[in-house]
């Protein structure tokens, strides 16, 4: 298989001058895949793949009805075995293409670094240079750095269709491709590397890309941990080093004049994997405990490996080197306290002080692992000998002791290498790896509180209370010095309470930082937050200490998801911040109010315009409120991978937030396929972290200087656009008869639910086919599969057209908004990507799946009309003659995939017809289930996203 090259514009041709190497590698990998298909699947399958590939390439060049009929007739003749092999061929081609593009992008960045000139927009060097030009001094930069918190949060939402086995093979192909590209190889070594790539492609072909069984929560936890082992443990120190080097270069004169700087540890990670129980009955207190223990074992294993490696580096011998007095005293103490470390060989490293110290540290970490092994073997920690590290602070003290000794004795350059990297790791990951968030739906807490109150005779009908009475009752309970003992609750409610008790215990046994936020989904009112605090109070997470002072070891993060909930943010948060006891608890937990904003459900609810604008306004309201009350604020952005779920480049997304609302802190979800694309390789992970952090720096200018506010007129225009766009979207999705039938019949939403790509059900309620029941992930995933991508653009065309009505003055204002307002620019940029990924010709074919052909055609025409209107209006406003003109490389990447996606979409349509055909027996229908599910994975790989 070789790569398709579409007809190119002049701009694209210039862009492709630097794209030659990419095309060569795509062609090379495609050729190897073709060889493997021929060898493993046989000539017939190879010829079939080639016929389809070339046929659909020709169809893209010339929309020939006779050729399309011929190709579709040919598809209908293929048996299920051949279809399965054909689908796999295209799916693996997409995986290889994605890997080649990732390697190519990394290679280009390395060329820029080696050339020593200007780097890519969003690099540390580019960002700091612009900040300095804008007047940010090194002192101000230090102030900004001291306020930063950058926290990606990994989730296990069922959108990652790629198996970990395949990711490991693709990682090896990435590294081999790097050897061919960057390293000068002898002809022999080059041939050997090419053979090794072919071997990996053979393994790829021989490894099933579709999971045979649905993953358990434990599987999902391990999948999340995979990215730390494969990339993040190396990428995090690298990104800190990159920032330090850029600061030294940009602020060289200040540093040479004697001004110093420190880059504090501001990168933190969070996770929902094993903690998110909203709608997932398989996440229990036991699985949450297992997640924490797996996290701890993963990170301590890494520390053990790195300490072992350091012992082969810090080999200084006495009397050839000097050590600090503190180091000498520590070694003497360790000889007594940890004598067992040297029991087998007392004189080990006797004259090598750093190696002897590191060996003691290695012994202590080994004891930590032994304790954990007891948990995984017997369900309880092994007996503690007293040698294990109690917490990360003890390990950091030992590492800093070595660091300071090296620096004091002239070895700062040695201290600043591998040892410094390990210190960064411990500062970042502690003994807990990442902060595990707990998420639960609000009604579960209300039910539990109601039973607690009834069982303790505090109140017998909590559900009948008004919101104000609930707040008063709950505040009263929180203010009591003592609460009554609890009886055993009913099953589900006892499980809710067990989670709070588990948090109390593991904060004590593992780390006070083991848990992040307690996220309440579907937060509608202030009592929902107070309910969680009362449950936390019952479990000992907050309350009064022996001195009578308030303490709180729980941070509650209300999640506002729907358009209506976003509009209620101000009264809900005001009620909380005006509650004196809540404020005292908030102060005790760090005086930080975190608020989570749901992109996915708000977009599904009211469309992309209503979602984006209501989220923008919500952030302004939260920022204003918390500032008035003297409370720090952090927004937690619940973004998905696709545009319809808040996706898009992280750097641009951060910059598009309302001016002055970021304030140095940002937390956001990284979901599904985003994880493998961003963190599957060290090199890309370091780049993605850097791009996000540089965006955070730029957006945090308000910490040290006034920032330009949005023109009030722009806000008013956006309000009008949103009103029209939301009305258009709701008219289609809620008021148009037959729309949901169209969705379920045209999109593979039911079939997606059959895929083994996540432990959580695809619907909130089984059998409920309403728009509110289908999860936002399934909603977006399904529209993407059928090439509608509807949630990411519907209503924008109508909104733009109805506002400007071809008035040139109004058009000029919209164009000025694109140039001056990052939010509006990012909105239309993301819309262009969604429009590019849509294909109305193919979507029309999916529309033919409707049982009522006339109704299906009518519905499609409504959607297609808005698509073309949106296409025309967006291009008009951004002043371009085609989509994504500002990002030609990305545009070409998407176009390069089109003729390979086309046959998979047509195969999927054919298989949906066969699988849903109730006129044949179940056995006949089941024949097509496996190849059908494979088309879903293949299209996901080709479009580079799922939900």
Show where each model-derived region lies.
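Beta-sheet entry/capping signal
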Residues: 264-266, 270-272, 280, 423-424, ...
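Often metal-dependent polyanion-binding catalytic scaffolds in large enzymes
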Residues: 1-474, 492, 647, 733-736, ...
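Carbohydrate-active enzymes and regulators
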Residues: 36, 51, 65, 100-102, ...
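Hydrophobic cores of alpha-helical transmembrane segments in multi-pass integral membrane proteins
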Residues: 34, 619-629, 864, 868-874, ...
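Catalytic or ion-translocation cores adjacent to nucleophile or general acid/base/metal-coordination motifs
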Residues: 283-315, 539-727
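Active-site cores of enzymes that catalyze phosphoryl transfer or operate on phosphate-rich substrates
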Residues: 363, 367, 371, 434-436, ...
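Long, compositionally biased intrinsically disordered regions
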Residues: 699, 706-947
């Amino acid at each position: 298989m070789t790569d398709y090259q579409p007809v190119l514009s002049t701009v694209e041709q210039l862009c492709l001058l630097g794209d030659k190497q990419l095309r060569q590698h795509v062609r090379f990998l495609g050729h190897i895949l073709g060889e493997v298909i021929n060898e493993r699947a046989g000539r017939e399958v190879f010829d079939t793949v080639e016929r389809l590939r070339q046929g659909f390439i020709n169809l893209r060049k010339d929309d020939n009805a006779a050729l399309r009929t011929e190709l579709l007739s040919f598809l209908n003749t293929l048996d299920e075995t051949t279809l399965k092999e054909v689908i796999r061929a295209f799916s693996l081609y997409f995986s290889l293409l994605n890997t080649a593009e990732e390697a190519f992008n990394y290679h280009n960045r390395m060329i820029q670094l080696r050339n020593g000139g200007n780097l890519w927009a969003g690099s540390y060097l580019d960002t700091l240079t612009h900040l300095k030009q804008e007047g940010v001094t090194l002192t101000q930069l230090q102030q900004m750095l001291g306020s930063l918190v950058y926290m990606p949060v990994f989730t296990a939402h069922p959108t990652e269709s790629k198996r970990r086995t395949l990711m490991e093979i693709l990682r090896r192909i990435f590294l081999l491709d790097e050897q061919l590209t960057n390293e000068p190889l002898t002809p022999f070594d080059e041939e050997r590397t090419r053979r090794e790539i072919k071997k990996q492609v053979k393994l790829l072909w021989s490894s099933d890309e579709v999971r045979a069984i649905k993953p358990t929560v434990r599987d999902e936890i391990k999948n999340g941990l995979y990215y730390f082992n494969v990339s993040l443990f190396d990428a995090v120190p690298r990104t800190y080093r990159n920032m330090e080097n850029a600061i030294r270069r940009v602020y060289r004169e200040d540093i040479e004049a004697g001004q110093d700087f420190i880059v504090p540890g501001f990168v933190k990670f969070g996770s929902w994997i094993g903690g998110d129980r909203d709608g997932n009955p398989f996440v229990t207190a036991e699985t949450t405990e297992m997640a924490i223990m797996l996290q701890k074992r993963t990170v301590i294993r890494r520390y053990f490996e790195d300490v072992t490696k350091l012992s082969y580096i810090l080999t200084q011998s006495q009397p050839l080197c000097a050590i600090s007095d503190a180091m000498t005293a520590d070694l003497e103490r360790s000889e007594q306290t940890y004598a067992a470390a040297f029991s087998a060989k007392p004189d080990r490293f006797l004259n090598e002080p750093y190696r002897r110290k590191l060996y003691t540290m290695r012994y202590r970490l080994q004891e930590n692992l032994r304790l954990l092994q007891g948990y995984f073997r017997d369900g309880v920690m092994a007996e503690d000998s007293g040698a294990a590290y109690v917490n990360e602070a003890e390990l950091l003290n030992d590492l800093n002791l070595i660091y300071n000794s090296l620096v004091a004795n002239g070895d700062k350059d040695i201290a600043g290498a591998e040892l410094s990297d390990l210190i960064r790791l411990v500062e970042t990951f502690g003994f807990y790896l990442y902060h595990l968030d707990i998420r639960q739906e609000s009604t579960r807490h209300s039910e539990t509180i109601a039973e607690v109150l009834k069982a303790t005779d505090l109140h017998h009908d909590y559900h009948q209370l008004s919101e104000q009475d609930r707040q008063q009752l709950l505040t009263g309970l929180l203010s009591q010095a003592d609460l009554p003992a609890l009886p055993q609750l009913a099953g589900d409610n006892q499980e809710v309470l067990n989670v709070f008790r588990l948090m109390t215990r593991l904060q004590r046994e593992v780390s006070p930082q083991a848990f992040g936020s307690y996220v309440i989904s579907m937060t509608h009112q202030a009592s929902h937050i107070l309910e969680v605090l009362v449950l936390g109070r019952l479990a000992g997470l907050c309350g009064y200490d022996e001195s009578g002072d308030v303490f709180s070891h729980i941070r509650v993060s209300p999640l506002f998801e729907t358009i209506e909930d976003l509009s209620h943010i101000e009264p809900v948060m005001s009620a909380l911040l005006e509650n004196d006891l809540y404020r005292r608890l908030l102060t005790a937990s760090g005086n930080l109010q975190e608020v989570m904003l749901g992109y996915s459900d708000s977009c599904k609810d009211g469309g992309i315009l209503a979602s984006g604008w209501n989220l923008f306004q919500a952030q302004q309201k939260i920022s204003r409120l918390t500032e008035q009350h003297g409370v720090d604020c952090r927004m937690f952005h619940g973004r998905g991978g696709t545009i319809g779920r808040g996706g898009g480049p992280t750097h641009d997304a951060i910059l598009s937030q309302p001016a002055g609302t970021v304030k140095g802190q940002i937390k956001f979800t990284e979901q599904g396929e985003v994880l493998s694309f961003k963190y599957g390789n060290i090199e890309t992970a370091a780049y993605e972290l850097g791009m996000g952090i540089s965006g955070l720096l730029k957006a945090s200018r308000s910490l040290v200087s006034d920032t330009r506010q949005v023109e009030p007129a722009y806000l008013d225009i956006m309000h009008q656009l949103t009103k029209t766009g939301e009305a258009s979207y709701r008219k289609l999705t809620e008021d148009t008869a037959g729309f949901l039938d169209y969705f379920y019949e045209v999109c593979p939403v039911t079939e997606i639910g059959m895929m083994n790509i996540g432990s959580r059900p695809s619907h909130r309620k089984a059998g409920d086919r309403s728009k509110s029941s289908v999860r936002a992930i399934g909603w977006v995933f399904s529209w993407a599969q059928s090439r509608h991508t509807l949630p990411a653009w519907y209503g924008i065309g109508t909104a733009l057209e109805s506002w400007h009505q071809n008035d040139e003055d109004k058009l000029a204002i919209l164009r000025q908004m694109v140039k001056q307002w990052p939010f509006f620019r990012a909105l239309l940029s993301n819309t262009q990507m969604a429009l590019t990924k849509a294909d109305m010709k193919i979507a029309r074919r999916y529309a033919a799946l409707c049982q009522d052909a006339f109704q299906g055609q009518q519905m499609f025409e409504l959607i297609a009309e808005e698509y073309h209107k949106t296409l025309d209006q967006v291009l008009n406003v951004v002043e371009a003659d085609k989509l994504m003109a500002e990002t030609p490389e990305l545009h070409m990447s998407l176009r390069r995939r089109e003729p390979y996606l086309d046959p998979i979409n047509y195969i999927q349509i054919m298989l949906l017809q066969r699988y849903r055909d109730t006129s044949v027996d179940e056995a006949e229908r089941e024949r097509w289930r496996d190849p059908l599910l494979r088309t879903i994975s293949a299209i996901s790989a080709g479009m580079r996203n799922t939900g």
